[in-house]
From Swiss-Prot:
This protein's domain notes: The contact of the 5th EF-hand domain from each monomer allows the formation of the homodimer and also appears to mediate the contact between the large catalytic subunit and small regulatory subunit for the formation of the heterodimer.
Native organism: Oryctolagus cuniculus (Rabbit)
Species lineage: Eukaryota, Metazoa, Chordata, Craniata, Vertebrata
Chain positions with N-acetylmethionine modification: 1
Chief location bin: cytoplasm
Keyword Cell membrane on entry: yes
Subunit note: Homodimer or heterodimer of a large (catalytic) and a small (regulatory) subunit. In presence of calcium, the heterodimer dissociates.
Binding positions (Ca(2+) 4): 135, 223
Protein name (record): Calpain small subunit 1
Top-level taxon: Eukaryota
Length: 266
């Protein structure tokens, strides 16, 4: 069993909201309109297999600890239960009804959003915002975003899953613009902690450094698609930790199958 300990403060807050209405053209721009990678390296060297294994375990332990430290007190709103997009509640606001109509146009005949459809949606939106520096959302990034939001493991996003993701993207896009103080279109390493804290993630220095190595360029600058991809993954990991920490002890135990499910489908 893996024992994951938590001993530092976490973040608060979950999905954002607002700005859902309008026709397809207006909504695509309005939903995302702002309010106003390199990978890590591995250790090497001689000393035998036992030493290498020890190094790997220390690295893995550090990753687990850094994540659990930040997740312990994170209190996001979980995505609502999955329902068909046409199941309109009597007290539903006109804004949400408009979003249902938008979803019906975006999702296609199966009324679910695939990774390819999500990629097309996001890339259409970011082209309307030249102040957001991005290389565009790639298919692999969107597959990962779908996977970590896919609560029922269908491989696609239903209405509530998509709405939760979309609300978060809108909130995080506003934060991105707010903390891009030099208007470079990117967030640099010194701007990153403030942006992440505004999004509800209070991380330690070790985890910030890991994120910069994974999601930023060689100069330490993070563009918009990497910023969103990183926050989607953090949000999902924190929600997973909270759901497994049923007693609120700041510790979870998972077997190897649960661990693989958490880490491989993401």
């Amino acid at each position: 069993m893996f024992l994951v300990n938590s001993f530092l403060k976490g973040g608060g807050g979950g999905g954002g909201g607002g700005g859902l209405g309008g026709g397809l053209g207006n909504v695509l721009g309005g939903l995302i309109s702002g309010a106003g990678g390199g990978g890590g390296g591995g250790g090497g060297g001689g000393g035998g297999g036992a030493g290498g294994g020890g190094t790997a375990m220390r690295i893995l332990g550090g990753v687990i600890s850094a994540i659990s430290e930040a997740a312990a007190q994170y209190n996001p709103e979980p995505p609502p239960p999955r329902t068909h997009y046409s199941n309109i509640e009597a007290n539903e606001s006109e804004e949400v009804r408009q979003f249902r109509r938008l979803f019906a146009q975006l999702a296609g005949d199966d009324m679910e959003v695939s990774a390819t459809e999500l990629m097309n949606i996001l890339n259409k939106v970011v082209t309307r915002h030249p102040d957001l520096k991005t290389d565009g959302f790639g298919l692999d990034t969107c597959r990962s975003m779908v996977a970590v939001m896919d609560s029922d493991t269908t491989g696609k996003l239903g209405f509530e899953e998509f709405k939760y993701l979309w609300n978060n993207i809108k909130k995080w896009q506003a934060i991105y613009k707010q903390f891009d103080v030099d208007r470079s279109g990117t967030i640099c390493s010194r701007e990153l902690p403030g942006a992440f804290e505004a999004a509800g993630f209070h991380l330690n220095e070790h985890l910030y450094n890991m994120i910069i190595r994974r999601y930023s360029d060689e100069a330490g600058n993070m563009d918009f698609d990497n910023f969103i991809s990183c926050l989607v993954r953090l949000d999902a990991m924190f929600r997973a930790f909270k759901s497994l920490d049923k007693d609120g002890t700041g510790q979870i135990q998972v077997n190897i199958q649960e661990w693989l499910q958490l880490t491989m489908y993401s």
